[in-house]
Amino acid sequence: MTIKDLKEGQSATICTVGGDGALRQHFLDMGVIPGIEVKLIKYAPMGDPLEIRIHDYELTLRLADAEQIEVSDKKSDEDEHRKDNKKDKALVEHPGLGEGGKYHVKADEHPLPKDEILTFALVGNQNCGKTTLFNQLTGSNQHVGNFPGVTVDRKEGMIKGYPDTRVTDLPGVYSLSPYSSEEIVTRQFVFDEKPKGIINIVDATNIERNLYLTMQLMELDIPMVLALNMMDEVRENGGSIRINQLESMLGIPVIPISAIKNQGVDELIEHAVHVARYQERPGRQDFCDPEDHGGSVHRCLHGIMHLIEDHAENAGIPVRFAAAKVAEGDAEMEKSLHLEQNETEMIEHIVSQMEEERGIDRAAAIADMRFDFIQRICRQTVVKPAESKERIRSRRIDAVLTGKYTAIPTFILIMGAVFFLTFNVIGAVLQNLLGKGIDYLTAQMDQLLTAWSVNTVLHSLVIDGIFKGVGSVLSFLPIIVVLFLFLSLLEDSGYMARVAFVMDKPLRKIGLSGRSIVPMLVGFGCTVPGIMASRTLPSERDRKMTILLTPFMSCSAKLPIYAFFATAFFPKYKALVMVGLYVVGILTGILVALIIRKTLFKGEAVPFVMELPNYRMPALKNVLQLLWEKAKDFLQRAFTVIFVATIVIWFLQSFDLHFNLTADSQNSILAVVAGLIAPVFAPLGFGDWRISTALISGFMAKESVVSTLSVLTGSMDVIHKILTPASALSLLIFCLLYTPCVAAVSSVKRELGSKWALVVVFGQCVVAWIMAALVYAICLCF
């Protein structure tokens, strides 16, 4: 019997974990090991993937992967352990180790030089509050979400009040096995940068799974502290953790904190600075019990340590960590050690003997050794409530949001509400108010310049260039901020992870996994972070496909274009046209995905293995910070890139080839240059040189399409003369699909290289031309 054969709500005990390679190791690292109880929660609305509960957290996997995990009806002893823990809820005083700790021996101090920078690596599982803690430590405003893998790159900052420190926020990982790009980045940072200390943040509500990474970090023999986050939730749900007993068993300082409430952070900083300054390394790194299963794993690890000791020292890798990785079959580690053939053969002999004695394979044996140690710790130090309030709430919400018959309609309803409120209600009202304010300021400035008899050239620059150009873009700020507000709320609440779960099966039909939905949804806000979010995908194939498809998801910078032309040509159907453009972008992306799946990216999507976090109320501070960052970014672009582009466009439009001021813009430098490419767009219905100019400026920033047209035409009457409703709709389709802005192209280049960046630029222009020509031809038939 396998997990696939279980019924919803049925529990069983894992017997064997099949499969091979990095995926199997990833399963083991996440606690899917023999002897552990697993419960099938539900199937996705379309029947695949499924959701299981293991180690007190929810995990998703596909049916094909579930078939690889054999289970039996035998019950686990976990409930008995939980009952034993509830007998004593006595809390132990704190602190014990670290700064001010009663176990600290002053005579053993060997501090680093005072002028040496203390570097820290902030490491933790995905979705454990790591970025929130980083913001508290440094005062930064990094994006905080409730989706596994929000941190897609390492970020650095100085700890507040400690100018001689530098802390790096690394991507969330479940282990230091090289399965995903995040794990590779984290592992390489620790090996290459050699931080003076590690701050390991652990989700106290799910401590058992989180401690697996803690054990691997301790094997690195780097001074570290453990930040026990979300302790407020543990206490509220009737649980507790014996801090000093946990410290004693781990041999590192343990500090209870609540990152979101900024509780315990000051104490954490004191401990972290202390252990780094005095290089107080973990008190233990050996977690294998000599008596466990006849001591087979213990003998194996210590035998390997003896063989590779010199190689590990030469490679700068802690010998205990290296031995554990070699024992579990980490090929990258074996390459790093440069072992001789006879040494490799000896290690294989030692491992084979251990597997024979232990009765399971090498990777499962090492994972079981770690989880066995973790369970012993948790039985003695952790008092768990029966079920947390957050879990109960999440289960009730999921009954609707991921229900078999309600998930898809609810998703459509939620996204429809987001667009309706953005374009028709909140965003539209605020846009009208801001637009009136800008018009008033423009009129006042025009009167002032006229009263002062300012030179006509300068007058034209200020009014026709700056105010009309930049002002036309600024009026769309409310729509963009409102859209980001809703996307932020959906991500922070944990709903995005459910969307990935629900949409995995349909996305697999176009060659992607459910996790790809999140970068593409983020792309509706801005393509750049959407492309960066693809780094959380463990497959290089999926990552490339997702990056190439994300620009087809219409970003918020195109909203000014849609609103401008929809208002001008389709005022009665403004909302319908704008929503329709988003649908066309999605459908075009699907079509492109089907084509490249059969040509450039043959093969199957990466397995869908993802944690489903509990729903959480988005923190007002985090949401406001995100909105401020997005608004500030938009304003900076409006007063830098768009401002400069507007002035350049005005200059080229106002002077001829001999740099004489021209009254007729058709004789301008701009008209001559743009006229060379205008014929390319003639079959699409917008062969006017002014439209060509606006499209070129849109490569710098999409918002500048509107500002450029405002400068070149001067009034809406001129735009109605050069465009018909059919050509306007064709132009909207082209703007929707043609090359993304230079910032997005730069992101593609950074992620995939120059070749793929050029593919995006020219490929999307070709797709946009074909689709626009098709729409224009259809419109002419009616």
Provide a role label for each language-model segment.
Residues 93-175:
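Conserved G1/Walker A P-loop phosphate-binding module
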Residues 234-289:
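Canonical P-loop GTPase G-domain recognition
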Residues 357, 364-368, 384, 428-466, ...:
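Extended, low-charge hydrophobic alpha-helical regions
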Residues 410-421, 483-488, 566-568, 581-595, ...:
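Hydrophobic core segments of alpha-helical transmembrane domains in multi-pass membrane transport
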Residues 278, 285-452, 659-670:
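Extended helical scaffolds that flank P-loop GTPase cores
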Residues 556-579, 743-752, 772-782:
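Transmembrane helix-loop junctions at the membrane interface of multipass transporters and ion channels
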Residues 162, 187-253:
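Conserved C-terminal guanine-recognition region of P-loop GTPase G domains, centered on the G4
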Residues 436, 440-444, 497-527, 602-626, ...:
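Juxtamembrane inter-helical linkers in multi-pass membrane proteins
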